[in-house]
Amino acid sequence: MMRVLVVEDNALLRHHLKVQLQDSGHQVDAAEDAREADYYLNEHLPDIAIVDLGLPDEDGLSLIRRWRSSDVSLPVLVLTAREGWQDKVEVLSSGADDYVTKPFHIEEVMARMQALMRRNSGLASQVINISPFQVDLSRRELSVNEEVIKLTAFEYTIMETLIRNNGKVVSKDSLMLQLYPDAELRESHTIDVLMGRLRKKIQAQYPHDVITTVRGQGYLFELR
């Protein structure tokens, strides 16, 4: 079973894809535009995304490029009515992993999804171990004492950055830049809120506070 993010502005097609995928045993989040897609991506951490190019608020290729620039690594399958070879090159160059041209059969979508997941799972696992903490870079998961902690994409990005810099202070500005490449979206208090939630989740598995706020400098991950 996979958690699939479907990003499609056509309501009938979006519903059809959602139902077919659910009938095949998958969990599905269905977004009608890029803004909603970003929400599901950050909150539900999907395994794979199916993205239509003609979204009302942002071009699908732009959305994929933005995800890739923010180190979002999940496989992306594009739905497109564009059949020219130049269009296909543009799709793949944007950071998409594969594409299906419209009209399509749902069986082809399923087959390409499975192929992408097999390819993704075949990549060598990259893990950072600072016992009892473990970060699986390929799965974007944080474990403590071999128990996976459920994190949002933003929370995971913070923890990966702090653990990569174990024992070193990471500035708030540096974290904000990774979370929000678009300067207009950055609000300094957002990091404080995320840190509060993150500390609570970690302390439910590990009794000591491993994230220290260094006043005027940033944050420090350090085992005590």
From Swiss-Prot:
GO terms for molecular function: phosphorelay response regulator activity; transcription cis-regulatory region binding. It comes from the Bacteria. It is found in: Cytoplasm. The modification 4-aspartylphosphate is found at D52. PROSITE patterns: OMPR_PHOB (PS51755), RESPONSE_REGULATORY (PS50110). Pfam families: Response_reg, Trans_reg_C. Phosphorylated by PhoQ. GO terms for biological process: regulation of DNA-templated transcription. Keywords: Activator, Cytoplasm, DNA-binding, Growth regulation, Phosphoprotein, Repressor, Transcription, Transcription regulation, Two-component regulatory system, Virulence. Residues 3-117 form the Response regulatory domain. The lineage of its organism: Bacteria, Pseudomonadati, Pseudomonadota, Gammaproteobacteria, Enterobacterales. GO terms for cellular component: cytosol; protein-DNA complex. Transmembrane segments: none annotated. Coiled coil: none annotated. Residues 125-223 bind DNA. This is Virulence transcriptional regulatory protein PhoP. InterPro entries: CheY-like_superfamily (IPR011006), OmpR/PhoB-type_DNA-bd (IPR001867), Sig_transdc_resp-reg_receiver (IPR001789), WalR-like (IPR039420), WH-like_DNA-bd_sf (IPR036388). The gene is phoP. The keyword Cell wall biogenesis/degradation does not apply. Member of the two-component regulatory system PhoQ/PhoP which regulates the expression of genes involved in virulence and resistance to host defense antimicrobial peptides. Promotes intramacrophage survival of S.typhi. Is required to enhance bacterial resistance to bile in the human intestinal cells. The keyword Transcription applies. SUPFAM superfamilies: CheY-like (SSF52172). Its main location: cytoplasm.
